[in-house]
């Protein structure tokens, strides 16, 4: 990619290495990479020529060092199916051996949930917002997850995320954002994970009303923060804990002389 920095030396146009640590030693960098790099997994004798973030999960899983069965369950004969399934298999391998996935061999990372963020297809003839759909799976493995939790925990996760998204988008943009539905369906990304999981179909990439916001960086920030708040709420509810949402820094800060002598008035949003 292309990474533009402001001209000259400033606080934003630099890479900083710090050796601030309790341990003695020297920190050095032989190279610095911005972004995820270019795809380097060859299929059919050549690489894609695309940045890695535009490639599928199957190729990332191989590059990340996942075991062969994780990224190539179809033995290299069906990359599309491997791409879909590798997402869940990575979660299971990473969490294997943890309290949330005790029977499966893996790296023991205690992942508590998984969320796949998608965009969906579909259009509205009335140019209305298609909106957000949540998907989960309960009819698998006798209704239980690997740690013994009821699979309806995935429904709770889906519901909390959809509710928070609808609330935050409406609050920030005064838009009646559509909450489409909650589907209990047989999808790989919600069936295979050993932990509670959901697919969030955020918006329709085919529908103009949705895409008016889809590429707005402010909208993306709102969505990202909304999902963070929803996951925080879900996890704390699971553990019976109170939670505090990380506050945002103030914006539109200004200072003006106050109405009384020798006073200043500070304001912000």
PLM ranges: what are they?
Residues 3, 13-25:
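Short beta-strand-plus-loop segments that form exposed binding edges in beta-rich domains
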Residues 25-28, 49, 53, 57, ...:
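Stable alpha-helical elements in mature extracytoplasmic
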């Amino acid at each position: 990619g292309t990474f533009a920095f402001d001209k000259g030396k400033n606080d934003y146009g630099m890479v900083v290495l710090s050796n601030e640590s309790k341990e003695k030693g020297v920190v050095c960098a032989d190279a610095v990479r911005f972004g995820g790099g270019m795809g380097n997994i060859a299929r059919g004798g050549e690489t894609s020529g695309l940045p890695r973030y535009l490639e599928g999960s199957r190729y990332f899983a191989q590059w990340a060092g996942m075991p062969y069965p994780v990224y190539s369950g179809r033995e290299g004969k069906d990359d599309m199916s491997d791409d879909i399934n590798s997402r869940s298999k990575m979660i299971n391998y990473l969490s294997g051996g943890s309290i949330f996935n005790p029977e499966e061999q893996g790296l023991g990372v205690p992942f508590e949930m998984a969320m796949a963020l998608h965009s969906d297809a579909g259009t509205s003839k009335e140019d209305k917002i298609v909106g957000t759909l949540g998907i989960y799976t309960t009819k698998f493995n006798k209704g239980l997850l690997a740690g013994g939790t009821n699979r309806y925990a995935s429904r709770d996760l889906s519901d909390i995320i959809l509710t928070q998204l609808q609330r935050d988008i409406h609050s920030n943009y005064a838009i009646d954002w559509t909450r489409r539905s909650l589907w209990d369906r047989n999808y790989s990304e919600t069936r295979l994970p050993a932990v509670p999981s959901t697919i969030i179909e955020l918006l329709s990439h085919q529908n103009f009303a949705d895409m008016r916001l889809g590429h707005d960086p402010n909208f993306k920030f709102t969505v990202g923060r909304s999902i963070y708040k929803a996951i925080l709420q879900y996890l704390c509810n699971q553990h019976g804990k109170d939670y505090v949402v990380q506050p945002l820094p103030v914006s539109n800060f200004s200072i003006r002389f106050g109405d009384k002598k020798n006073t200043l008035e500070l304001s912000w949003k």
